[in-house]
Amino acid sequence: MEYRILGKTGLKISRMGFGGIPIQRIDAEGTKALMHKLLENGVNYIDTARGYTVSEEYLGIGLEGIREHFVLATKSMSRTAEAMAKDIDISLKNLCTSYIDLYQIHNAPPADLEKVCAPGGALEALTAAKTAGKIGHIGITAHSLETFRMALELPWVETIMFPYNIVEDQAKELIHACAEKSIGFIAMKPLAGGAIEDAVTALRCVCANPDVTVVIPGMADIAELNQNLAAVNDSSPLSVEEEAKMRAIRDALGTQFCRRCNYCQPCSAGISISSVALAVSRARPLGEQ
């Protein structure tokens, strides 16, 4: 397993991490088996969120006795200091840990990011928690390119998480800017929320970009983990055949895949089209149709 330094945090993490959304559909014992398999294979970065129902709780059980071997990241949708402080304490309890390595502001559109940074905003609680040793570092996750651009200019941002995959590569220049500014870049949605079925080609594509610090595919069983490990541990250049597969995937999804650019807005019926598409992509890993 290749390891990278997660930007300004200085944390040494595996090139592939563990995305904690799919474990909502298994159980605590299944999560424990996955955690031990991660440890055996050198995967040391785990991502979850307050909003992922039982994910934090399952991970807290699954990491019993081995917590110190992992870099643990979670996130909250809270925008005020009071709500964020409560969420940090809940995360600590759920994850059965005295500290969380990386705590992230979850999916903040530009207007919310301004609230987070304002007096009484969530950043106050995150900074206080960092001073108290409850969390180690502060990051942000986003689906908006404008949020990504804004985050790059904020001195307190140590990591940025954003969708990046074969069909969603519109942030490539911003990802390169992360590398130049020593901001860790975390690639989420490497399979485009399940739209890309060829996981090996998808992960190989993401890891071919040297500016990506870590990719975090979701996994619900050992078979998925083994498949993802084989892809990420293959450091050979992309082959002509793989490049052809990538073009075919882009062609197949290019006219129907939502990139959340919002060029389709405003909707005459008042529907947030990109929000609906995002909800569908989030439901897919949970087995919802």
Q: Can you annotate each of these PLM segments?
A:
Residues 26-29, 36, 40, 79-186, ...:
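Glycine/proline-rich, positively charged
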Residues 1-70:
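N-terminal binding-site loop/beta-alpha segment at the start of enzyme catalytic domains
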Residues 19, 49, 103-106, 141, ...:
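Conserved residues at the C-terminal ends of beta-strands
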Residues 2, 34-35, 58-62, 87-91, ...:
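A general structural detector for well-ordered alpha-helical segments in enzyme core domains, enriched
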